[in-house]
Regions:
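Anionic-ligand binding patches
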Residues: 2-8, 15-185
Length: 185
């Protein structure tokens, strides 16, 4: 018998899905994985990118779906890499970011969860986490986790066992889950 899901998570990034699935399961939401590459517009707004991606995802999936877009915004680099974080990570990686950051290491991670169903009206859930860029790679996480130290912490995301409770993604997914569960009542 096929598994039934409440909603799908559309992405080509299995790490994002696994993190989202674990978080949403705490709220009783069954999340399926719709593995797909989505059209991503070149835009400096995470919200606009997420909104476009979730419409693309719904048109492909034909089921209630969420997408996530996030970015690392570094103060001393005027918010760079921001919405271009994925591309920048693929090209220069964490070591490249560490070389670019000066004395001001303040940064924030922002996340947007976008939901769309048959109404075709995207609903967005946004959050951010302030912190600093570490001086070197710490831990074995994926993406920028080994260089981002959340505010009031001494370890990077990659080193924190409780990362899922502190992350920008967790905060956005929690907002979504509360809305989704109330919508179902």
């Amino acid at each position: 018998m096929p598994q039934s899901y409440d909603i799908f998570f559309a992405s080509s990034n299995v790490h994002k899905y696994e993190e989202a699935e674990k978080i949403l399961s705490e709220f009783g939401i069954k999340l399926g994985f719709f593995k797909t590459g989505l059209t991503e517009i070149q835009e400096d707004s995470l919200s606009k990118i997420a909104e476009q991606k979730v419409m693309d995802a719904f048109n492909r999936c034909k089921n209630a779906v969420i997408v996530e877009d996030d970015g690392l915004f570094i103060d001393s680099l005027s918010g760079f890499p921001g919405p271009f974080s994925s591309y920048v990570f693929k090209t220069i990686g964490n070591n490249g970011i560490l070389k670019l950051v000066g004395d001001d290491r303040d940064a924030q991670f922002r996340a947007v969860i976008a939901y769309c169903d048959s109404n075709k009206k995207p609903i967005l859930f946004e959050s951010n986490v302030f912190g600093k860029i570490s001086k070197n790679l710490q831990g074995n996480g994926w993406g920028y986790d080994p260089i981002f130290v959340p505010e009031n912490q001494t370890k990077t995301y990659a080193e924190l066992a409780e990362k899922n409770k502190l992350s920008h993604r967790y905060k956005s997914l929690k907002k979504f889950a509360n809305w989704f569960n109330n919508k179902q009542e």
